[in-house]
């Protein structure tokens, strides 16, 4: 439980860092006079290394151990976040965002492999559901913390990053001192119970890499990652533009500062993602994972279409529903991936997967910016994202047939 909690807290933080730029992009854009296109590229500056770096981080985790990579990610992110206090021109900010993405990229291959290696298939979805809930809370906390800080100190996005740096450093110390995994490559190589049939049943040693199902899953997460990146980067802006919090302001009898209102609305929407992850983790069983993953992708389509024409408070409702169904895919996907990977290669497998999901997903923000600048609304961009989600929903379906794949939970029967 302690291991799951520590790793899940590191997961919450990585998504807080990932979503940090979207939470303050309007303030940064105002300071440096960025256009919407330039703001989209600012998101890409963080998301591209965040995705591509995951593959190389997976190689390092397989070589040096997951715990060392987690500690490096936390202390590196702390250093870069604190460096924003001395940020100068716009080119420096792009460089700092790139560096932050590099260190943040280290989390998923190390953290997910650690959890996959410490759990059995039948309990993995529930553990990853908890892991996903904290990740969603991390995403939601980014705009919430930004909104709170910008309410108290308007325009102070640097102080926001200083706070994130302090949180990163503190968690780095806790992981360094308290995280006690079974050991890299354990238990089938290092356990004193090596050779015990029960251990072999839990940790099969002859599970082979299966390229066909892995490729289908990775293509699906690349498409879903584009949807994720495109919606999240401009979510505070999308919700702010329509007065989505007007009913809440009327109920409270007070106005929310203009610099914070989009962030508070985005935080409310993204909290719904945590409930989606929890529900998916609770309902998932090894035999239902492909079907549920396909459904989670497919449910993005009507939500995104609703978001294209929703106005006022309905934008917030549409965004809440989208977040709920979109984030359901994460515990399902992360439970399926290790079933097609040998245990000693799960870090690099998750690394490549996240490279595709977040790396290809880095085109999402400039894609949305391109269409919105040209057509002055979200109709074309969100409709295009809905099309990508539909294609993603088709890809897990072949995994339902044992004629095409041999899954870990079949192997252990």
Q: Which residues fall in each region the model found?
A:
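C-terminal transmembrane helical hairpin of 12-TM major facilitator-type secondary transporters
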Residues: 288-333
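Paired small-residue
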Residues: 91-99, 314-321
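Extracytoplasmic gate region of multi-pass secondary transporters
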Residues: 21-22, 213-270
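Conserved MFS/SLC helix-loop-helix module at the cytosolic interface between two early adjacent transmembrane helices
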Residues: 52-88
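Cytoplasmic helix-loop-helix junction between adjacent transmembrane helices
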Residues: 96-135
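Helix-loop-helix hairpin linking two adjacent transmembrane segments in secondary transporters
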Residues: 131-183
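A late C-terminal transmembrane helix in Major Facilitator Superfamily
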Residues: 345-374
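Residue-level signature of mid-helix packing/kink "hotspots" within the transmembrane helices
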Residues: 19, 47-55, 140, 270-278, ...
């Amino acid at each position: 439980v302690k291991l799951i909690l520590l790793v899940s807290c590191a997961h919450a933080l990585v998504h807080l860092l990932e979503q940090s730029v979207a939470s303050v992009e309007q303030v940064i854009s105002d300071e440096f006079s960025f256009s919407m296109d330039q703001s989209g590229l600012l998101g890409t500056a963080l998301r591209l290394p965040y995705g591509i770096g995951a593959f190389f981080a997976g190689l390092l985790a397989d070589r040096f151990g997951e715990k060392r990579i987690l500690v490096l990610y936390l202390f590196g992110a702390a250093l870069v976040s604190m460096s924003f206090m001395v940020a100068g021109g716009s080119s420096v900010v792009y460089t700092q965002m790139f560096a932050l993405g590099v260190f943040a990229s280290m989390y998923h291959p190390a953290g997910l492999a650690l959890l996959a290696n410490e759990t059995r298939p039948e309990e993995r979805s529930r553990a990853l559901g908890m892991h996903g809930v904290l990740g969603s809370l991390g995403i939601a906390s980014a705009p919430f913390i930004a909104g709170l800080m910008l309410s108290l100190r308007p325009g102070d996005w640097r102080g926001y990053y200083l706070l994130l740096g302090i949180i990163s450093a503190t968690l780095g110390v806790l992981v360094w001192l308290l995280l006690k995994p079974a050991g890299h490559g354990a238990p089938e190589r290092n356990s004193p119970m090596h050779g015990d049939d029960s251990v072999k049943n839990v940790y099969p040693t002859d599970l082979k890499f299966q390229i066909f199902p892995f490729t289908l899953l990775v293509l699906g997460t690349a498409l879903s990652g584009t949807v994720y990146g495109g919606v999240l980067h401009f979510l505070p802006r999308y919700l702010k533009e329509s007065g989505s919090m007007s009913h809440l302001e009327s109920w409270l009898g007070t106005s929310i500062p203009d610099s914070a209102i989009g962030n508070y609305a985005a935080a409310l929407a993204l909290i719904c993602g945590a409930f989606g992850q929890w529900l998916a983790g609770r309902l998932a069983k090894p035999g239902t994972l492909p079907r549920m993953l396909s459904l989670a992708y497919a449910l993005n389509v009507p939500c995104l279409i609703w978001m294209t024409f929703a106005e006022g408070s309905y934008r917030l409702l549409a965004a809440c529903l989208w977040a709920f169904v979109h984030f359901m895919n994460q515990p399902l996907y992360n439970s399926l991936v290790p079933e097609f990977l040998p245990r000693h290669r799960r870090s690099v497998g998750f690394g490549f997967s996240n490279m595709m999901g977040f790396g290809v997903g880095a085109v999402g923000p400039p894609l949305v910016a391109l269409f919105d600048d040209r057509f002055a609304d979200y109709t074309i961009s969100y409709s295009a994202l809905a099309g990508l989600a539909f294609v993603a929903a088709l890809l897990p379906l072949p995994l339902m047939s044992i004629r095409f794949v041999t899954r870990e939970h079949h192997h252990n029967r």
